[in-house]
């Protein structure tokens, strides 16, 4: 019996350690019940129809975006972008329980003196934009259940979107009883992109148990799964896309004015590790994992996990009209099939005008490739609408298709037909998307350095230097980073042959761009005085990662492949993309190179980013790993980061190197910065585990307890984070025999890993823990979904390391930089 108990304890510890089956009892508790396609959202439960969610028309944000003049429809689109959350406050409340309380947006919004942060330093600490017209609270607000939320200034008028008579909230549960009904736009929170909603679960019983002091000060209270908070927090598009204007930066980043803010520049400064793990405790491995996201980046598959940690820089939205026009001029067509045919297209809303040219019935769309891997490929509106699902709209349905954060359950596609049938929130979002698209077309104009305060001081190079920069750009960069280009020969336009033949077309295109004929034509185009006008500064094509040599984890993302969560939002052309071949990866402990065969079916590519306003968007690469970070949004700070980042890009020897392996690997490996553990607070597990099993766990793994909290580890400092985070928990796309072999290998690995950790003494050092784990590294790599650990490598064009001839001279690199600053 004792041996049986010990084996059970080992297995449970292994599962907890990798946060996979994570406390399977909690996952089952939260996920048991209905099947996909059988549930409705809160709006439908309350008897609301999509037509009752009318888009707000008040031009409250008129000073944003450089004061651009908008039509009434564009005003509605901007309001939707900024304040419409589509009922996703339910999702962010549920996620607090899945994350064991370490994620809590109400804490992020608070200025309680016991926290590490407040409104006074919210920008510098979180990188979140303080909404104008608010100030720091001096105490708990009795009108808001004692919570320390920002207070609206007396000299400001009311927020028009809070008007519940004009925009009546969804009356379910306790709303209208123990809490107000509220508006369907919620209340302003003091942070742009986050709105407060009365919690319909905050009934009389919850109100009696509520204690604001304990919520801020007592972990046994606020780290309990059954805690019901009086508010839920909804998230709009603005959370990830609003930031300080590069050409009108605030004098004080903690207190911006509306005229200092842009809706399209992107949240380039937010710290997702601190936002999604408010204690920011580096002893927690989850914080270590989130910390791999540099400021201004996040993993878009963090929730619907694909077992790949792939932080991506937040997209700026520039030149949308030019981007769409480029899709047409390059004949960048995608063929839709299956559920992707159900997406709304611009033609469904516009009967004439330029926005009608991007779809041809029954199945052809000319579109931008929005996600970094080019997976958003079913039309501009499909890309806009999908994002709302990814931030929690109709979470009742979405969460039935996977286990959030931890995985361990086969992912199935969320179907547009189910969304339309069961979610008024979804239908309202679809109806408002065309106005959003029109707003983004109008507002996504470039931010030029020459128009920024003091920008001229950074544009002092001679005309001759910039002219040389144009030649260098034409020869080295424009084949990818210009939407204006010579017409490719027949069979050499990759954009026109997306699908199984794409890579062959790409190879022909790439060879053509090396010819003198191409370069001479391209030089003429770049020298033209109108080169920057209506130029997206990208051809928006998908580039094979074998050519880029960048980290492979982003292009390996699988959320949009056939049968996965975003199946209905990617084209058949994307799903039919061929394998790009083999990449080289490096053992994170020895530096030894190995080969990895990239799969087919959509993965393996990265779409070309635009260079519009590149002076303002450093650090570089798809994960913000090339260049330093400066929290100041001033022109001087942006230029300081740009200069350092562009030097690292063009002189790769200046990039950060791995402290353990140095030059044995081509860059930096993200490693844990301190000894860490996977932690599960007592309030999230004790009540669900029988006393006998808790006692057995204590006997066999005494070092895994911190009081009643579970503490699985230790994970030593210096551990490659992606060695653990990228472990492929479930077999995918394999026959039964291969899947069984994978599962057997995984079970054996987890058992041995748990056993190795169990044997460590209570006073084990990092060296002891590393010694215990090291023998298992080859097996961890074998079962990794992405074994590429070097995060800042690649994009060596013009440096001599791209395999295309000698690099540029230092003078030519300086000339190129002089030109880039004018973009």
Task: Please give the residue ranges for each predicted region.
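Periplasmic c-type cytochrome electron-transfer domains
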Residues: 4-15, 19-823
């Amino acid at each position: 019996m004792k041996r049986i108990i010990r084996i059970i304890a080992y297995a449970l510890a292994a599962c907890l350690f990798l946060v996979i089956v994570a406390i399977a009892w909690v996952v089952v508790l939260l996920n048991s019940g209905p099947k996909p396609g059988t549930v409705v959202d809160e709006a439908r439960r309350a008897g609301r129809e999509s037509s009752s969610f009318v888009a707000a028309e008040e031009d409250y944000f008129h000073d944003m975006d450089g004061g651009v003049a908008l039509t009434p429809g564009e005003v509605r689109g901007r309001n939707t972008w900024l304040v419409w959350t589509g009922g996703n406050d339910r999702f962010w409340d549920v996620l607090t329980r899945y994350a064991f309380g370490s994620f809590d947006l109400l804490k992020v919004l608070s200025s309680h003196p016991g926290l590490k942060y407040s409104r006074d330093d919210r920008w510098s600490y979180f990188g979140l934009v303080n909404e104008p017209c608010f100030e720091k609270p001096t105490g708990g607000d009795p009108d808001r259940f004692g919570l320390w939320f920002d207070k609206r200034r007396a000299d400001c008028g009311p927020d028009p979107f809070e008007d519940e008579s004009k925009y009546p909230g969804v009356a379910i549960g306790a709303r209208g009883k123990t809490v107000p009904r509220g508006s369907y736009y919620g209340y302003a929170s003091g942070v742009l992109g986050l709105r407060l909603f009365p919690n319909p679960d905050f009934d009389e019983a919850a109100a009696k148990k509520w204690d604001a002091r304990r919520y801020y000060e007592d972990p046994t209270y606020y780290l309990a799964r059954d805690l019901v908070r009086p508010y839920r927090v909804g998230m709009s598009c603005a959370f990830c896309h609003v930031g300080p204007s590069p050409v009108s930066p605030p004098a004080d980043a903690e207190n911006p004015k509306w005229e200092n803010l842009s809706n399209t520049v992107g949240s380039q400064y937010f710290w997702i590790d601190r936002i999604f793990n408010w204690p920011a405790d580096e002893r927690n491995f989850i914080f270590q994992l989130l910390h791999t996201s540099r400021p201004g980046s996040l993993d878009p598959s963090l929730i619907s996990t694909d077992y790949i940690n792939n932080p991506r820089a937040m997209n700026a939205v520039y030149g949308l009209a030019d981007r769409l026009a480029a899709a047409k001029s390059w004949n960048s067509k995608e063929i839709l099939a299956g559920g992707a045919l159900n997406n709304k297209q611009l033609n469904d809303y516009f009967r004439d005008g330029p926005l009608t040219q991007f779809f041809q019935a029954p199945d052809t769309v000319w579109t931008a490739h929005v996600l970094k891997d080019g997976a958003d490929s079913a039309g501009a509106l499909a890309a806009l609408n999908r994002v709302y699902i990814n931030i929690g709209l109709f979470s009742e349905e979405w969460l039935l298709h996977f286990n959030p954060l931890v995985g361990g359950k086969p992912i199935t596609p969320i179907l547009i037909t189910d969304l339309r049938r069961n979610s008024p929130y979804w239908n309202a979002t679809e109806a408002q998307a065309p106005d959003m698209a029109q707003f983004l077309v109008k507002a996504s104009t470039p931010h030029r350095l020459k128009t920024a305060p003091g920008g001229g001081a950074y544009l002092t190079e001679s005309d001759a230097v910039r002219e040389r920069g144009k030649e260098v750009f034409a020869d080295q960069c424009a084949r990818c980073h210009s939407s204006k280009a010579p017409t490719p020969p027949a069979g050499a336009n990759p954009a026109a042959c997306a699908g199984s033949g794409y890579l062959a077309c790409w190879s022909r295109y790439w060879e053509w761009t090396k010819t003198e004929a191409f370069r001479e034509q391209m030089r003429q185009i770049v020298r033209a005085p109108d080169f920057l006008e209506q130029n997206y500064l990208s051809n928006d094509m998908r580039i094979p990662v074998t050519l880029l040599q960048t980290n492979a984890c982003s292009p390996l993302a699988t959320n949009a492949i056939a049968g996965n969560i975003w199946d209905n939002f990617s084209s058949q052309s994307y799903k039919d993309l061929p394998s790009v071949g083999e990449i080289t990866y490096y053992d994170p402990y020895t530096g030894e190179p190995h080969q990895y065969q990239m799969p087919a079916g959509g993965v393996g590519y990265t779409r070309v980013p635009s260079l519009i306003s590149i002076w303002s968007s450093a650090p570089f690469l798809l994960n913000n790993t090339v260049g330093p970070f400066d929290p100041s949004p001033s022109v001087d700070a942006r230029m300081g980061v740009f200069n350092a980042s562009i030097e690292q890009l063009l002189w790769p020897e200046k990039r950060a190197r791995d402290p353990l392996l140095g030059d044995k690997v081509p860059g930096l490996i993200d490693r844990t910065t301190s000894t860490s553990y996977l932690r599960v607070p007592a309030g999230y597990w004790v009540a669900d585990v029988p006393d006998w099993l808790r006692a057995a766990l204590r006997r066999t793994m005494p070092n895994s307890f911190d009081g009643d909290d579970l503490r699985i580890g230790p994970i030593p400092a210096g551990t490659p984070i992606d060695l653990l985070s990228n472990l492929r928990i479930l077999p995918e796309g394999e026959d039964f025999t291969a899947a069984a072999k994978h599962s057997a290998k995984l079970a054996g690995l987890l058992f041995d890993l748990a056993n190795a950790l169990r044997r460590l003494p209570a006073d084990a050092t990092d060296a002891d823990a590393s010694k215990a784990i090291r023998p298992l590294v080859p097996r961890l790599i074998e079962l990794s979904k992405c074994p590429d650990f070097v995060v800042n490598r690649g994009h060596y064009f013009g440096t001599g390391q791209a395999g295309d001839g000698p690099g540029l001279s230092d003078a030519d690199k300086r000339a190129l930089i002089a030109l880039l600053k004018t973009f």
